[in-house]
Amino acid sequence: MIQTIRKAWGIPELRRKLVFTMLILLIFRIGNAIPVPYINTELLGNYIDSMSGTVLGLYNVMSGGAFAEATVFALGVQPYINSSIIIQLLTIAIPALERLARDGGEAGKKKIASITRYATVAIALLQGLGYYMICKNYNILEQSGIWPALVIIVSFVAGSSFVMWLGEQVNEFGVGNGISIILFAGILSRVPNMISMCASYIASKGSIGYLWIALLIVGILAMIVLIVHVNEAERRIPVQYAKRQVGRKMYGGQASTLPMKVNMSGVLPIIFAQSIASLPATVWAFVGTPDKDTSPVAYSIYSAIDTKSVLYLIVYFLMIIGFSYFYATIQFNPVEISNNLKKNGGFIPGFRPGQPTSQFIAKVLNKVTLFGAIYLGIVAIAPLIVGKALDNYSLAIGGTSVIIVVGVALETVQALESQMLMRQYKGFLE
């Protein structure tokens, strides 16, 4: 990775792109330090820390801690991610959107992007309103009234919209995927906090603390190696193209492959599963923890669905597997792939074009997705199990964060390598 960046730095055009990307990240970090007025950040930080296993805790991790500090960029890229997922699902459910995405070409892509932007602003407005209501209900506001409410909500909506714009600028003038890189920077900003927590844990546990932290570091390194290998792993189905004559020229006849990535859906199944699985705990957090003596039944239910319970881990793991299959079928439709192969004169050796081909692709997809889903589940719940073993010690960076950081790093390096390769070909042709 460092070697690739050094080589890219030697190319003037790529150096400008890298500098531009770093400037955008600097602006993002400055925005993360600007507080929104009328909110007591100390009380808010204590409240968010108590909600570490809920949806609010997930938002805090994804924003790099800005959510708990009530900064202008507190909502971060979450509204954009949510709107992208919703539009993606609506594209499948609504035929008009499906046709626009499939047959609209460049104009269709721009229209979908425009719809996603409007949806981002709408979701940011709802989340900003929810943020304000939490602060109001838990007496976190320093001043209440219509004007403070407007200032807080507008600040969050404007901040989220500006973050979306920053990501789009990186897409156009920088390197890699802008939203992913901003998410990457936000998560990495939590590393000093994690180091501080590790130091506190060692101080409280003594020599045994050193042993646990050493094992934790080894586990994180092993997880990174696993993520790198699985992210790059793919199943390649051989494809043969029939020869065809157009005029006096003969086309086709070459062999190719149909790549099928093991982790096709990325980190989305984990985000969706965590949001849904932690909803009961989030509701209990708002209602209040039931008393064990006065409400034993309610307390038993609360203990069963708590984010540190065994039942939660099982439900969370199964949800990740379910969402992995759901997203895999969305992104890799066997029937559509089979039809495209048939139209272009391609076929899989040993299988007739049409239904037999689609059935074979679906069978392979199910096997590959199962492995990828189990991998995602293990990576997601491993930090929770480790935290439970360490006396409910809460990790500042979990499995979801590690997958995002490693995935974005690999994606950015690949983008740099492809741009360097493109410029080598350009120089040769010139």
Q: Model segments located where?
A:
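N-terminal cationic and glycine-rich segments that engage phosphates or anionic surfaces
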Residues: 1-430
